[in-house]
Design a protein with these regions (language model features):
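FIC/Doc superfamily catalytic core
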Residues: 1-127
């Protein structure tokens, strides 16, 4: 079973901003906070990111932040990249890590099938 720990402790809000700014720059898109979602998402992230949680909960936190839309563009890509980076904290073969990165990216983006979501849950709970 994958341990409960502060998966996002090394990702302060400034790093979330940097991730989004980098993605926007690569795509020549406007990097700007939204008036509706930015402050709420920032407060949620800052109150949650140091907390110990299951990997499934950390991925769900990223999914929820994507849905809250703190930035004008690339919210999904921003939080999916952060979620995929958590996979590097696991001792996995390169093939398993690639599969898991793909799964968490799809979950955060909201495009994972029920089967993919179940596969991720089972992976996180296996001995």
């Amino acid at each position: 079973v994958i341990q409960t720990k502060p998966w996002l402790a090394e990702v302060p809000w400034d790093l979330v901003i940097f991730q989004n700014a980098s993605l926007c720059k690569q795509k020549n898109a406007l990097h700007k906070p939204t008036s509706d979602g930015y402050e709420t998402t920032k407060a949620f992230w800052e109150s949650s990111q140091q907390q110990p949680m299951k990997l499934t909960e950390a991925v769900d936190l990223c999914r929820r932040c994507h849905r809250m839309a703190p930035f004008c563009f690339y919210n999904g890509n921003t939080f999916a990249a952060i979620a995929r980076s958590m996979v590097s904290q696991l001792d996995l073969s390169e093939a398993d890590a690639a599969i898991l990165r793909s799964l968490v990216g799809h979950i955060v983006a909201g495009v994972a099938t029920p089967e993919q979501q179940e596969a991720f849950r089972r992976f996180c709970e296996k001995d």
